[in-house]
Regions:
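Glycine-rich beta-strand-centered segment in the early N-terminal region that forms part
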Residues: 21-38, 50-90
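NAD(P)H dinucleotide-binding glycine-rich loop of Rossmann-like/cofactor-binding domains
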Residues: 45, 82-145
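Short, well-ordered loop/turn sites that connect or cap secondary structure elements
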Residues: 76-77, 135, 221
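Short, glycine/polar-rich helix-capping loops at beta-to-alpha or helix-loop-helix junctions
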Residues: 91-94, 169-177, 237-242
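Adenosine-nucleotide cofactor-binding segment
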Residues: 143, 159-216, 265-267
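N-terminal Rossmann NAD(P)H-binding glycine-rich loop of SDR-like oxidoreductase domains
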Residues: 147, 155
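Residues forming the Rossmann-fold NAD(P)(H) cofactor-binding site
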Residues: 152
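Glycine-rich phosphate-binding loop and adjacent beta-alpha segment
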Residues: 161, 172, 212-284, 310, ...
Length: 318
């Protein structure tokens, strides 16, 4: 099969379409012929040699894809069935082996290609806001990086579930994009201090920046507020005052989806399909795929994401 590999470990953009072994199936896995794969920040970091896959998982990049079951193995699934796939790796290839519990249906109103840009972001956003932070209607939610793939999905999901949403982004154009998705409060982090603008406002914060925002995030939370950190794009280290947290009973969770064990991922997929797929199918959440590249041009897709110029989701097609 064809797959994307990093030709030179010292050059994260040296992505080449090369020949690779088609995966062999373990018990409980299906072989999926990939139609399209979503591009995520984790793929860029893996290409830099800083985010290796969990032990035993594919070394090929790609944390989500969608396609058609080629071989159902021992699962009892149907050959030719269209599915979305949550992956620990392997999506940047013609074929990928997927644990049955990490398969999703294709939403009734989406194409297979659109589904490729939904699975990982939906599972990430729901598992952190819905399952970990316990988000409920009426909550006030701050989303950092509101114009990206995670942020644009989170805005729509929060609004669909009856929350008030504030976002940070770095340009007027990106903030306008967030407004069109439903964001209520828009903050340009290059010109405004979100902690001063929103001091004590947020019930929940979804953060992809990490250490540099830690102290400001704590200032922004209200009593019983929850900070969920899912990436460290700005670095892993910051200052945290427990003295500011304890009187207001604040909590901080730092987590990734990729490293979770398969049974936990299967539970997340089930809960996401149950709670989020209906919002997609009734049109309250749309995938917002704003750029598509053929698999062979994965380096261009990574360049676009790394530039910060894109909004929404980037997808690779086979």
């Amino acid at each position: 099969m064809k797959a994307i590999t990093v030709a030179n470990p010292e050059n994260p953009r040296s992505l080449e379409l090369t020949d690779a072994e088609t995966p062999t199936l373990n018990d409980g896995e299906v072989l999926v012929k990939v139609t399209a794969a979503g591009v995520n920040r984790g793929d860029l970091v893996q290409a830099q040699g800083k985010y290796p896959p969990p032990k035993g998982e594919s070394e090929i990049m790609g944390l989500e894809c969608a396609g058609v079951i080629k071989d159902p193995g021992t699962t009892g699934r149907t050959k030719g069935e269209e599915v979305g796939c949550l992956l620990a790796g392997g999506g940047y290839a013609e074929y990928v082996a997927v644990p049955e519990g990490q398969l999703t249906p294709v939403p009734k109103n989406l194409t297979v290609e659109e589904t490729a840009g939904v699975v990982e972001v939906a599972c990430t956003v729901w598992s952190n806001l819905g399952m970990t932070a316990g988000m409920q209607a009426g909550d006030k939610v701050l989303i950092h990086g509101g114009s990206g793939g995670i942020g644009s999905f989170a805005i729509q999901m929060c609004k669909a579930m009856g929350c008030e949403v504030a976002v940070t982004a770095g340009s007027t154009e990106k903030l306008e994009y967030c407004r069109e998705l439903g964001a209520d409060i828009l903050i340009n982090y290059k010109e405004q201090d979100f902690a001063e603008e929103l001091k004590g406002w947020a019930d929940i914060i979804l953060d992809v920046i990490g250490g540099p925002y830690l102290e400001q995030n704590i200032k922004t939370l209200t009593t019983d507020g929850r900070l969920v950190v899912i990436a460290v794009q700005g670095g892993p280290k910051g200052t945290l005052s427990l003295g500011r947290m304890m009187p207001r009973r604040l909590s901080v969770t730092a987590t990734t989806l990729r490293a979770r064990p398969r049974p936990m991922k299967a539970a997340i997929v089930r809960s996401t399909v149950e709670n989020v797929w209906p919002l997609i199918e009734n049109g309250q959440i749309t995938p917002n795929i704003t750029a598509t590249f053929p698999l062979a041009e994965a380096a261009k897709a990574h360049d676009l994401m790394d530039s910060g110029d894109n909004t929404g989701k980037i997808v690779l097609t086979m």
